[in-house]
């Protein structure tokens, strides 16, 4: 990655407060929640501070336990060879690793995992 992104504490807090409000609203309206942590490429250094990224995942897990909804971590389900590359953001014009997008097969894997969890989750709550 060309840079390491850090958590901005004020924005992070506001975003999590907003997320918590959405969770409460969903539950008030009897909407089932399945939250997942998105896939991320894991064969190279990720563009986030590891401590910040771990905190984020732990905070999602905490919310799932507090509000009793299903949370799954899918960060490692897309194989590294299925991640996309992007055009350079520097003067070098070399392609760069894209941490946000993966190829079609990666989307199929993600969809299959989410579908499996939804089927299992809805079966468990009905």
Regions found by a protein language model. Name each.
Residues 53-126:
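Catalytic His-Asp segment of secreted/periplasmic serine-dependent ester chemistry enzymes
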Residues 1-77:
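Conserved, well-ordered alpha-helix/loop/beta-strand core segments that scaffold catalytic motifs
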